[in-house]
């Protein structure tokens, strides 16, 4: 899955840098990827964080804020026994123990709005 994700990001970067049309991008992507595949693909809503604040828009928005290719992979954290999602409190502990930042969606949205207010945000 890591190789698939890396190649998808590389190809997405190329598509964006070459400013390909939607048809050209679909052709380029379709030459290497098929659906269904072993990694579910989610697309952010048109307008990104301006029009939607779901997990996909938040993840892609975070990549954009970091000036990374807006291609991300999501994974659900599970309880140690594998029976259900990890609670937010336990996810915070897990992140803290590993010195990994833990962000709430509201923090990503606030950073997005702050950056969009900067004069050079459209550049």
Residue ranges and their predicted role:
Residues 1-123:
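Catalytic domains of riboflavin
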């Amino acid at each position: 899955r890591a190789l698939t994700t890396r190649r998808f990001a590389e190809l997405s970067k190329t598509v964006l840098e070459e400013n390909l049309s939607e048809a050209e991008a679909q052709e380029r992507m379709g030459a290497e990827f098929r659906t269904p595949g072993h990694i579910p693909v989610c697309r952010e809503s048109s307008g990104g964080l301006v029009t939607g604040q779901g997990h996909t828009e938040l993840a892609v928005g975070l990549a954009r804020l970091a000036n990374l290719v807006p291609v991300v992979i999501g994974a659900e954290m599970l309880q140690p026994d594998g029976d259900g999602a990890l609670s937010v409190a336990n996810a915070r502990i897990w992140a803290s123990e590993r010195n990994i930042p833990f962000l709430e969606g509201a923090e990503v949205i606030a950073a997005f709005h702050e950056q969009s207010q900067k004069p050079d945000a459209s550049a």
